[in-house]
Amino acid sequence: MISFLRGTVAHVGLSTAVIDLNGAGMSVYATPQTLSRLHVGEEGKVFTSLIVREDSMTLFGFADDDEREVFEVLLSVSGVGPRLALAVLAVHDPEAIRVAAHTGDNKTFTKVPGIGPKVAGRIVLELAGKLVPHGTAPAAATTAAEASWKPQVVAAMTSLGWSEKDASASIDKALADEPEVSFRGNVPEILRTTLRWLGQDGARAGNRVGSRG
């Protein structure tokens, strides 16, 4: 297995680069972000993943090992080939992909050209548990984190007129639509997200204690 290439950059194109290794030119496909870090005539290093097919062997290059790891995990999804996996990395950085996979955020993947809702749903389904954000706490710790911020958000909402029951239910429903907000655990952001969710439907705003007849 070729883990990385280091040598003089001989060429940088729109989708590939050529690394000169003691007179042998190795061509690698890479994202625009990775290619932008390579400069002709200078030493360059890319982490690589070798894809072997019946009639070809193709190298894909990455800025770091994390990017390569995400690429290879994406390849485990049925229907996702190396070009599509690379396209995902061209649109989103590895951590954003980890967060989207961890929170079940289909919309992140539909932003990638060539990925529709059906494929995005399959990616999220098949990546469940395979990609997690760096520093993600175990489930028990996540529950403990929620226990620390939720009472604060509920208290803020009750001060605005909602009952504790309605406030708690609204928070849960709002964050079900935007799970990445819950993951960050920022109280003001969670409050804004919940109030925005309530404001999207006039009927929801009627849940305030003071507005009941």
Swiss-Prot record:
The keyword DNA-binding applies. It holds the Pfam family RuvA_N. Residues 1-63 are annotated as: Domain I. CDD domains: UBA_RuvA_C. Residues 145-213 are annotated as: Domain III. The keyword DNA-binding applies. Keywords: Cytoplasm, DNA damage, DNA recombination, DNA repair, DNA-binding. Residues 140-144 are annotated as: Flexible linker. GO terms for molecular function: ATP binding; four-way junction DNA binding; four-way junction helicase activity. Residues 64-140 are annotated as: Domain II. It is found in: Cytoplasm. It comes from the Bacteria. Its main location: cytoplasm. GO terms for cellular component: cytoplasm; Holliday junction helicase complex; Holliday junction resolvase complex. One of its GO terms (biological process) is DNA recombination. HAMAP family: DNA_HJ_migration_RuvA. Has three domains with a flexible linker between the domains II and III and assumes an 'L' shape. Domain III is highly mobile and contacts RuvB. The RuvA-RuvB-RuvC complex processes Holliday junction (HJ) DNA during genetic recombination and DNA repair, while the RuvA-RuvB complex plays an important role in the rescue of blocked DNA replication forks via replication fork reversal (RFR). RuvA specifically binds to HJ cruciform DNA, conferring on it an open structure. The RuvB hexamer acts as an ATP-dependent pump, pulling dsDNA into and through the RuvAB complex. HJ branch migration allows RuvC to scan DNA until it finds its consensus sequence, where it cleaves and resolves the cruciform DNA. Belongs to the RuvA family. Homotetramer. Forms an RuvA(8)-RuvB(12)-Holliday junction (HJ) complex. HJ DNA is sandwiched between 2 RuvA tetramers; dsDNA enters through RuvA and exits via RuvB. An RuvB hexamer assembles on each DNA strand where it exits the tetramer. Each RuvB hexamer is contacted by two RuvA subunits (via domain III) on 2 adjacent RuvB subunits; this complex drives branch migration. In the full resolvosome a probable DNA-RuvA(4)-RuvB(12)-RuvC(2) complex forms which resolves the HJ. NCBIfam families: ruvA (TIGR00084). This is Holliday junction branch migration complex subunit RuvA. The gene is ruvA.
